[in-house]
Amino acid sequence: MASTSRLDALPRVTCPNHPDAILVEDYRAGDMICPECGLVVGDRVIDVGSEWRTFSNDKATKDPSRVGDSQNPLLSDGDLSTMIGKGTGAASFDEFGNSKYQNRRTMSSSDRAMMNAFKEITTMADRINLPRNIVDRTNNLFKQVYEQKSLKGRANDAIASACLYIACRQEGVPRTFKEICAVSRISKKEIGRCFKLILKALETSVDLITTGDFMSRFCSNLCLPKQVQMAATHIARKAVELDLVPGRSPISVAAAAIYMASQASAEKRTQKEIGDIAGVADVTIRQSYRLIYPRAPDLFPTDFKFDTPVDKLPQL
């Protein structure tokens, strides 16, 4: 017997004996089979993917046409509809040159708004190379907010941007507000407002961000070697443990730690270079750096190879 569980409102069929096994789908028979024990845990399975057919009169010609889009469970009717493609023969047009067969697709205004938002979310995610699971979670968040009508008066693009920010936090791959701003047309201030309103409306939360959440990506974008990244991570963690940076954002602390580590190595980076990657101003980096500089000897890992001694580091 198949057991089902809900993940983000989407059903998942699992084997009762091997719940972690990835089921094998037999499309010909319409069965879902457990590869571990061979149990058929689902039958008469319907393929909800998009369907392609070939309508060419010439069998040697390949012109597959989509005759059905994939099902979208986030829309009210699953977005199951029939689309008529453009004709190519003379019989497809009337005497005025207009297509005889045209789409008469009915879609509610709410579904149309969600479809537009989903497209915008996918576009934003593609621009910063976010995986599909982030897009799916963002779409689910947007649907919940939209149906609750709790953010009436806010632009859908702003809500979508805030949902993307929340989804990244919840999936453990946080992005900064400025990174989301860069791929959307929404200001940081508006995304921040929607972010707080969404958390309140959905009664959900996100994990607190730490300096470690950004360190690897920032250092990679700055083309810094592994030794500098490890040193910057150590510096930031020790600075927090020693309570040297109270009230400072993890992003500014991470940027200051990277600046200190790079200045002590042969791979030096300027405040502007780091600020451009981290999305913080030079003055913000300097303020955090000044807080940790007096304890610099205590912040570096013991095995760090200095190119510039601690006492020669910039004092700013």
UniProtKB/Swiss-Prot annotation:
Expressed in the inner cell mass forming the embryoblast. Not detected in cells from the outer thin layer trophoblast (at protein level). This is Transcription initiation factor IIB. Changing residue 295 to E: Inhibits interaction with RNA polymerase II. It is found in: Nucleus; Chromosome. Residues 189-193, 249-252, 283-286 are annotated as: Core promoter DNA-binding. Sequence repeats lie at residues 124-200, 218-294. Acetylated. Autoacetylated; autoacetylation at Lys-238 stimulates transcription activation. Changing residue 200 to L: Reduces interaction with VP16. Residues 244-316 are annotated as: Necessary for TATA box-bound TBP complex formation. Changing residue 185 to L: Reduces interaction with VP16. One of its GO terms (biological process) is protein acetylation. Changing residue 37 to S: Does not inhibit interaction with TBP. Inhibits the recruitment of RNA polymerase II into the initiation complex. A zinc finger (TFIIB-type) spans 11-42.
